[in-house]
């Protein structure tokens, strides 16, 4: 057997030792992985994670509000950072329960986790950050450095931590890029030097196995060879023939025999040791001087290592390397004498290859470690942090400890990290440069090119060319040019020609006579000239109606279709001062004998330009007489050939040559504009006319007029007589005669030239464009681009939008955008006229800036003079429109600048119809701008010292709170009609013969969606909570920061105090304890106010101050705490705590107000009792409405039969619900002279209740007292209470179809009758108060007969009225007997005082009512009525006495 401890270069020995080293490395890696998992397991243990452990043990109910507040504050700070962040490589991934996850991308993604302290922002220390390790990603070293700094710093915030991490990451990227460029230059120089050395080196031929490799690889191999030789030395002194030793070496774990340091440490040490060495090393395959080393030396060196290991199991790198270096030096001193064979050489080559593989693996690990070291080197000196002084601090930055700086900045690292850093950085740069850029370019370019261009070009062209154009050519043009000419030439035209020629010219000219005739007959200006004489008008009407009726209708229909497609909507725009500043000359064209070319607009006489405000173009020219009205008033010109009634408003501007004049309103259709026109225009002062032919798009007709029209027969002039006889033949024209005349005209003109539309630029004759004569005032916006942006915005899903979209389900996005484009066009045209401009913000028509100039205001207003004096160009208003809800939801209007006095900004933002429940969809943006003008004229004024100040952000939050809660702080009431969108008109039309809620006759009718309503209320409350929270945060910053903001006046003029009154009056404690977080937020909004804000609590809004409201609420809190005395503290401790906090706050507030020297004490109030009996009744019986009383529970025995848990204790949830409702009863029960509800409950057992309802006026129950008992079952409030009536004449009287003689009350809310879902009992919503109000208003009514099922159909009939009267007479009699006399004689226990006061004060009214009942009673019952009346009078007199 070959000796195991043979020569160092023995192949077998080397293989074993190589396996030995390989085994050491594998064991090291395995132990490292095991150690890593042990660490992770310890970190995941909840006992070692204090934050997670505490979160699990704490009660979620107690921490719910804190978590919500903490999460909201963190989100606000992150939103601030995102607004300023410009680095796209840094993004927020998630936010969850104080954990923030960041993503930093530079070639590869780094996931950073930031943990906030539990009580943040109250606690601003204890932050931590770490990088989540991912595969093939080298961690960022500055993250661990930052984590060390976070643990020792105080007064930190999420915003600052994220900001500095992002700044550090940006610096890291810059430094890494600069380092890469330097390394590349350095590598080039080293490669050149190495190439020169290689050319000079000579390899010895005496060593055939010598291998030349890369310098760095050679260093690695030599270093491993050193390690192998050291291991060989340790084993040379052991005898080879010892079986025990040999067995021990083979069987024992190799890791126990020799201690080998971490390979990564060895490589790093090798780098430093070989830094100054040569770049080329020879590897010897054989050596004559090689031999075994001294056994004593090997044993001593091995013992040194083992001795150190025993003392310190974690050997330091320096100690191990020093031992290895010493032993290596000793080995070099001794020469090997054992020659090697060829087999040894081959084995050595294999060994070298294996060593190279191991070195490469070590090299990869070295690269990662070195890059981490480079990061530390880059940021070791640049990252510093300054400890903030106290609470006021600005910024901080990371600081690297001194020890870390000394370790990371090592000179030998430079050479070793040259090549690895290059490889890593090159890959990083390529990823960043290649992938994101290509994706962005492809997506954006292709979408824009494909979508916008193709859609617009295809749709617009096809619709105009195919549908509307062809029909007009076939029907309208040909028929009108053939048929009307014949009739006019024979009869109708004769009279017209005579009048027109005589009036217009002294010497008739054929050309002048011909063309007006053709125009007047076919296009109908005839009425204007002939209107003065009745005979001529009659003659002209009939032929036009008979001949031109059908063609005109067809043409009009087609044009209307085209107009809808082209023009979005009819505009109601008033007249501008001028349509154009100058006019252009038309293009020259050919002319004939009967027409003259227009070469200069100055040659034109007096005429009118027709302007269409919808399209923004001039559509024609009109020539005619100016009306007799004043020149500055609008007049209407109607085309007589428009029989369809489809009219449209245009404007006429008078021109003389090219000089514009006055403007008139014009109404008509485009029918007239679809034909070429020959117009006579008077020239300057010479009494002559010039005839011009206009066609569409400024093209003059080139063809000659037919001879039959140019040279009319002489009989035309001779036969013109203004005699009525000529009218008769016109009316009696037969169709056959008309056909023959038409055929003859066609034959005559068959071979002659006529006016041909194909000769013009627009062959179909759809448009007349006089753009060369006039300047078009087009809208200076790209409407197509605005439309595309609006469509994209409308198609996006908005998850923050929680408003109901029920009315928009059938309203398509395209229609909504078209509607908005219309309003935008209207707004622009109105602004041109009234002196304001509009600017879409980022080409978004749903976000508009309105710039109001001084001309927008009345010149006698204060604000107008202030703008002139202070040289203010405009007032900026912003209008934001909800793109998903428009026009069914109001826009948001805000004043941007300047600051205007008298709280104008709040008035503008809270105009009455801008509230959601008062919005009218018919109100346009133009209406809103007009109301803004009225507000500015009435209230606007500027303070030269304050007008440049910007509005504080808290102002906008207060406006939002006003709009959400409906608390209007504005003194302005708009003239616009405000409507209720609750479909009241529809409900009135339904034929209902019963009172809603009684439980009868609802089969087949529509029902309201309770779940949808509940969801809407929930969303609204959430928005209110978020808005109020922002106000509290900003108000706290203003108060603590002592900012120079007049917050007191802002709060006084806003809805803040009215809203708090609304919360504590209408909301009451019953609603507030349902949401403790909201209750606490409202309480905090008052607790943060200092003594300077005390006048706000004393200011009276609607005759009541906030202090008075809080005083009553404080009493309710005392009462509520008393009702909870039977409940364990743990069951409702949160409610008790928040109520006690309020009571403590109110105590401090009242104490501060007592010391306030500017107010009077609230106790010095004078109680004024009105002489009016109604006020006396309310004041006297106000204290009788709600009282405690020890009720006789035995009388409720018949109501307990239906309770499943009669003898069991009441559930704590039911007790809490009843306690809350009792608070509501104390302030919400009605006490009125007409009808009241008086309530008693047992303080010992609040499940038992009694109440009396006094009968409403004008009913058969008037002023009677009706007694009820109510019991809350064990399942309350999930089920309705049990109600029974006791005023039944001892079970003999039924007062109402819903009130039975046995005491049963039939109502759908009580589950005793079927009803709609919204009328049934709804847990958590319905209450005992609702039950009592339902009985008062829906059962005790004026006509109870119709509450009977089946009788409602007879309402309004004679029979039904008669039966109802008879039923009421019985009810009146029983009301006197049992609800008045019996109650006075036998008052209900607990209501004695109330009954006496009630009948005493209402005695005169009761006597009068009962006397009326007697008079209306039937004769056979009057005596019985009289007996009851006499007895009642005696009882009433005794009470009054």
UniProtKB/Swiss-Prot annotation:
Could you tell me the Gene Ontology terms of the biological process aspect for this record?
A: DNA protection; protein ubiquitination
Against Pfam families, the record matches this protein to:
UQ_con
Question: Membrane topology type, per the record?
Answer: Single-pass membrane protein
PROSITE patterns the record matches: UBC_2
Q: Basic and acidic residues compositional bias: what residue ranges?
A: 180-199
Q: Does the keyword Transmembrane apply?
A: yes
Molecular functions (GO terms): ATP binding; ubiquitin conjugating enzyme activity
Q: Per UniProt, which keywords does this protein have?
A: ATP-binding, Coiled coil, Membrane, Nucleotide-binding, Transferase, Transmembrane, Transmembrane helix, Ubl conjugation pathway
**The keyword Iron is annotated on this UniProt entry:** no
* Coiled-coil residues: 63-89, 340-368
**Ranges for the UBC core domain?**
1217-1380
Q: In which pathway does it act?
A: Protein modification; protein ubiquitination
User: May I have one GO cellular component term?
Assistant: membrane
Source organism superkingdom: Viruses
List the biased-composition ranges (Acidic residues).
539-549
Where does the UniProt annotation locate this protein? Answer: Membrane
Q: Region labeled Disordered — which residues?
A: 180-207, 283-305, 505-554, 577-605
Transmembrane ranges, per UniProt, are 20-40
Do you know which Gene3D superfamilies this protein is assigned to?
A: Chromosomal protein MC1, Ubiquitin Conjugating Enzyme
Active site positions: 1306 (glycyl thioester intermediate)
> What is the protein's given name?
Probable ubiquitin-conjugating enzyme E2 R521
Lineage, highest ranks first: Viruses, Varidnaviria, Bamfordvirae, Nucleocytoviricota, Megaviricetes
């Amino acid at each position: 057997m070959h000796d195991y401890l043979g020569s160092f270069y023995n192949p077998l020995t080397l293989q074993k030792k190589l396996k030995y080293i390989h085994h050491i490395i594998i064991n090291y890696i395995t132990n490292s992985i095991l150690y890593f998992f042990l660490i992770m397991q310890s970190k995941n243990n909840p006992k070692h994670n204090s934050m997670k452990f505490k979160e699990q043990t704490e009660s979620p109910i107690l921490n719910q509000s804190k978590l919500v507040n903490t999460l909201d504050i963190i989100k606000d700070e992150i939103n601030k950072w995102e607004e300023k962040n410009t680095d796209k490589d840094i993004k927020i991934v998630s936010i969850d329960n104080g954990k923030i996850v960041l993503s930093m991308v530079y070639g590869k993604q780094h996931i950073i986790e930031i943990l906030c302290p539990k009580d943040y922002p109250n606690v601003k220390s204890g932050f931590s950050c770490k990088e989540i390790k991912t595969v093939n990603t080298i961690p960022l070293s500055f993250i661990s450095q930052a984590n060390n700094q976070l643990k020792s710093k105080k007064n930190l915030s999420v915003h600052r931590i994220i900001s500095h991490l992002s700044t550090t990451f940006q610096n890291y990227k810059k430094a890494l890029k600069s380092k890469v460029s330097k390394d590349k230059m350095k590598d080039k120089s080293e490669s050149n030097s190495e190439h020169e050395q290689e050319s000079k080196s000579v390899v010895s031929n005496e060593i055939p196995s010598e291998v030349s490799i890369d310098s760095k690889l050679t260093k690695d191999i030599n270093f491993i060879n050193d390690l192998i030789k050291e291991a060989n030395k340790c084993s040379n002194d052991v005898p080879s023939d010892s079986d025990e030793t040999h067995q021990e070496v083979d069987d024992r774990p190799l890791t126990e025999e020799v201690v080998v340091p971490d390979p990564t440490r060895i490589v790093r040490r090798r780098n430093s040791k070989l830094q100054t060495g040569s770049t080329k090393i020879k590897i010897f395959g054989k050596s004559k001087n090689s031999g075994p080393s001294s056994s004593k030396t090997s044993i001593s060196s091995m013992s040194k290592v083992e001795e150190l290991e025993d003392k310190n199991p974690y050997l330091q790198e320096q100690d191990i390397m020093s031992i290895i270096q010493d032993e290596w030096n000793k080995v070099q001193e001794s020469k090997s004498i054992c020659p090697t064979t060829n087999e040894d050489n081959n084995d050595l080559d294999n060994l070298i290859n294996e060593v190279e593989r191991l070195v490469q693996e070590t090299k990869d690990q070295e690269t990662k470690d070195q890059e981490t070291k480079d990061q530390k080197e880059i940021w070791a000196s640049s990252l510093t942090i300054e400890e903030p002084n106290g609470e006021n601090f600005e910024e901080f930055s990371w600081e690297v400890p001194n020890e870390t700086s000394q370790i990371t900045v090592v000179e030998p690292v430079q050479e070793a990290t040259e090549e690895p850093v290059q490889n890593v950085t090159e890959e990083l740069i390529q990823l960043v440069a290649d992938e994101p850029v290509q994706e962005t370019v492809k997506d954006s370019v292709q979408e824009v090119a494909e979508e916008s261009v193709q859609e617009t070009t295809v749709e617009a062209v096809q619709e105009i060319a195919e549908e509307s154009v062809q029909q007009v050519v076939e029907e309208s043009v040909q028929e009108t040019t053939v048929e009307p000419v014949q009739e006019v030439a024979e009869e109708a035209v004769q009279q017209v020609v005579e009048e027109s020629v005589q009036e217009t010219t002294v010497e008739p000219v054929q050309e002048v006579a011909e063309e007006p005739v053709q125009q007047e007959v076919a296009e109908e200006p005839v009425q204007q000239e002939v209107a003065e004489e009745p005979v001529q008008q009659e003659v002209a009407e009939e032929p036009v109606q008979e001949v031109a009726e059908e063609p005109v209708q067809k043409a009009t229909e087609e044009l209307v279709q085209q107009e809808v497609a082209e023009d979005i909507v009819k505009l109601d725009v008033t007249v501008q001062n001028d349509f154009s500043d100058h006019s252009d000359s038309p293009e020259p064209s050919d002319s004939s004998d009967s027409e003259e070319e227009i070469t200069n607009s100055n040659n034109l006489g007096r005429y009118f330009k027709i302007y269409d405000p919808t399209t923004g173009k001039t559509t024609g020219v009109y020539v005619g007489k100016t009306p007799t009205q004043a020149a500055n008033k609008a007049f209407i010109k109607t085309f007589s050939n428009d029989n369809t009634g489809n009219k449209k408003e245009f404007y006429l501007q008078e021109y003389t040559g090219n000089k514009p004049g006055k403007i008139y309103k014009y109404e008509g259709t485009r029918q007239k504009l679809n034909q070429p026109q020959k117009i006579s225009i008077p020239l300057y002062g010479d009494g002559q006319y010039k005839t011009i032919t206009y066609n569409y798009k400024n093209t003059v007709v080139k063809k000659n007029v037919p001879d039959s029209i140019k040279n009319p027969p002489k009989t035309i002039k001779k036969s013109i007589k203004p005699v009525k006889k000529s009218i008769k033949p016109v009316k009696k024209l037969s169709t056959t005669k008309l056909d023959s005349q038409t055929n003859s005209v066609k034959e005559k003109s068959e071979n002659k030239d006529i006016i041909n539309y194909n000769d013009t630029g627009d062959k179909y004759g759809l448009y007349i464009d006089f753009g060369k004569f006039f300047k078009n005032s087009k809208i200076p916006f790209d409407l197509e681009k605005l439309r595309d942006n609006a469509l994209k915005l409308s198609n996006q899903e908005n998850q923050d939008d929680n408003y109901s979209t029920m009315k928009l389900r059938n309203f398509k996005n395209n229609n909504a955008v078209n509607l908005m484009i219309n309003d935008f066009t209207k707004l622009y045209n109105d602004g041109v006229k009234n002196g304001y401009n509009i600017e879409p913000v980022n080409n978004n028509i749903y976000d508009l800036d309105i710039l109001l100039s001084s001309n927008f205001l009345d010149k006698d207003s204060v604000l107008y003079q202030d703008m002139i004096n202070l040289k203010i160009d405009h007032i900026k208003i912003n209008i934001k429109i909800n793109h998903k809800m428009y026009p069914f939801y109001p826009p948001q209007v805000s004043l941007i600048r300047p600051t205007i006095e008298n709280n104008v900004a709040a008035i503008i933002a809270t105009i009455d119809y801008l509230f959601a429940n008062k919005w009218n969809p018919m109100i346009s943006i133009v209406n809103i701008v007009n109301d803004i003008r009225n507000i500015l004229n009435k209230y606007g004024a500027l303070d030269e010292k304050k007008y440049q100040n910007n509005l504080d952000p808290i102002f906008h939050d207060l406006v939002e709170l006003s709009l959400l809660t409906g608390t209007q702080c504005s003194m302005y009431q708009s003239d616009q009609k405000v409507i209720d969108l609750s479909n009241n008109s529809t409900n009135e039309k339904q034929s209902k013969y019963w009172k809603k809620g009684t439980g009868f006759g609802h089969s087949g009718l529509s029902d309201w969606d309770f779940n949808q309503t509940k969801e809407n209320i929930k969303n609204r409350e959430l928005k209110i909570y978020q808005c109020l929270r922002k106000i509290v945060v900003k108000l706290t910053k203003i108060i603590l920061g002592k900012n120079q903001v007049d917050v007191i006046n802002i709060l006084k003029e806003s809805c803040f105090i009215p809203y708090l009154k609304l919360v504590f009056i209408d909301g009451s404690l019953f609603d507030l304890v349902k949401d403790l977080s909201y209750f606490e937020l409202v309480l905090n909004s008052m607790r943060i106010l200092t003594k300077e804000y005390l006048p706000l609590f004393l200011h009276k809004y609607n005759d009541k101050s906030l202090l008075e409201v809080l005083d009553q609420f404080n009493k309710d809190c005392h009462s509520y705490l008393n009702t909870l005395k039977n409940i364990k503290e743990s069951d409702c401790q949160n409610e008790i705590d928040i109520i006690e906090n309020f009571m403590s706050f109110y105590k401090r507030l009242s104490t501060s107000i007592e010391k306030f020297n500017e107010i009077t004490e609230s106790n010095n109030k004078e109680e004024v009792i009105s002489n009016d009996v109604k006020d006396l009744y309310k004041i006297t019986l106000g204290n009788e409405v709600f009282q405690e009383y020890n009720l006789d529970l035995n009388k409720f025995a018949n109501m307990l039969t239906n309770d499943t848990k009669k003898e069991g204790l009441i559930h704590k949830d039911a007790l809490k619900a009843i306690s809350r409702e009792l608070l509501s009863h104390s302030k919400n029960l009605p006490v009125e002279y007409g009808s009241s509800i008086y309530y008693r409950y047992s303080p010992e057992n609040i499940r038992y209740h009694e109440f009396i309802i006094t009968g409403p006026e004008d009913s058969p129950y008037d002023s009677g007292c009706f007694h009820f008992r109510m019991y809350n079952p064990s399942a309350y409030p999930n089920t309705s209470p049990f109600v029974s009536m006791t005023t039944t004449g001892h079970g003999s009287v039924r007062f109402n179809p819903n009130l039975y003689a046995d005491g049963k009350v039939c109502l759908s809310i009580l589950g005793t009758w079927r009803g709609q879902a919204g009328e049934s009992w709804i847990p958590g919503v319905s209450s005992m108060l609702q039950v009592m109000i339902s009985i008062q208003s829906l059962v005790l009514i004026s006509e109870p007969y119709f509450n009977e099922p089946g009788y409602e159909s007879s309402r309004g009939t004679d029979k039904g009225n008669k039966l109802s009267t008879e039923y009421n007479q019985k009810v009146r009699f029983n009301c006197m007997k049992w609800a008045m006399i019996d109650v006075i004689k036998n008052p209900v226990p607990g209501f004695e005082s109330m009954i006496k006061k009630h009948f005493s004060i209402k005695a005169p009214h009761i006597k009068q009512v009962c006397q009326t009942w007697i008079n209306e009673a039937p004769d056979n019952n009057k005596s019985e009525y009289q007996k009851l009346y006499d007895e009642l009078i005696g009882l009433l007199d005794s009470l009054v006495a």
